[in-house]
């Protein structure tokens, strides 16, 4: 079994276009592992320092390594967000209407993983969701009214925080990057915000009461509010 896993790992690494990423995936795969300096890698891999520097910058932008002046190059925990964020924002720069398509992907992802995700939440997690609802309602009832955008983002991400799936988490986090990029966080109709947060409050109460089928139904219903808005 171990030999099969090793062979599969090697086969996947061979498909990477970057010699640097191939090296990291096979020799420095654990988060915190140090990657040798570029001059050392240049000799070992037979590539110029210039070429390796280019590959390092790509790896850094993809969030696959950490680069600091004194500590050098280190592997980091795998995170899907940086890669998908760059592609998504580029797509929106070309055509802002793509936000609706990505929003549909996000809605189906949330609905598909909702029951599994919220079943894993701790008592403290659930209390945090309630606190976010209370903070948002306080902003909406204040003078002047404030848009509870951070609470909105934190609530949705918070419902899925215990999922051990970096692709789902990255996809959902990228949605909020896109939401802010198209400036849906800047202005909202007050009635829309009231309706959204009424749904949020009921969803959270369903989570806390373990009425997950009802909570899922409300989640799906509430997604229609943004469809109507955009």
Regions found by a protein language model. Name each.
Residues 25-29, 118, 208:
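Short, locally clustered residues in the helix-turn-helix/winged-helix DNA-binding domain
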Residues 95-96, 183-186:
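Short alpha-helical transmembrane interface motifs in multi-pass membrane proteins
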Residues 188, 192:
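Solvent-exposed loop and edge beta-strand segments that line ligand/cofactor-binding
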Residues 1-105:
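Short linear motifs at protein or domain termini
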Residues 105-184, 196-200, 205, 214-225, ...:
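Conserved amphipathic alpha-helical segments that form helical-bundle/coiled-coil interaction surfaces
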């Amino acid at each position: 079994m171990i030999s099969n896993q090793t062979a599969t790992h090697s086969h996947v690494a061979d498909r990477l276009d970057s010699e640097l990423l191939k090296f990291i995936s096979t020799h420095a795969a654990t988060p915190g592992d140090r990657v040798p300096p570029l001059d050392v890698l240049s000799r070992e891999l037979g590539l110029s320092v210039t070429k390796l520097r280019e590959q390092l910058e790509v790896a850094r932008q993809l969030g696959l390594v950490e680069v600091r002046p004194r500590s050098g190059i280190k592997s980091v925990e795998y995170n899907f967000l940086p890669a998908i964020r760059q592609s998504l924002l580029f797509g929106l720069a070309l055509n802002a209407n793509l936000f609706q398509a990505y929003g549909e992907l996000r809605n189906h992802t949330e609905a598909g993983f909702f029951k599994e995700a919220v079943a894993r939440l701790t008592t403290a997690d659930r209390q945090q969701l309630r606190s976010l609802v209370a903070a948002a309602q306080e902003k909406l009832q204040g003078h002047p009214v404030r848009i509870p955008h951070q609470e909105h983002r934190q609530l949705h991400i918070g419902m899925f925080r215990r999922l051990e799936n970096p692709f789902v988490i990255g996809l959902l986090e990228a949605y909020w990057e896109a939401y802010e990029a198209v400036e849906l966080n800047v202005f909202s109709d007050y009635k829309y915000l009231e309706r959204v947060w009424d749904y949020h409050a009921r969803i959270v109460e369903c989570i806390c009461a373990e009425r997950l089928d009802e909570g899922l139904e409300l989640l799906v219903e509430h997604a229609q509010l943004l469809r109507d808005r955009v």
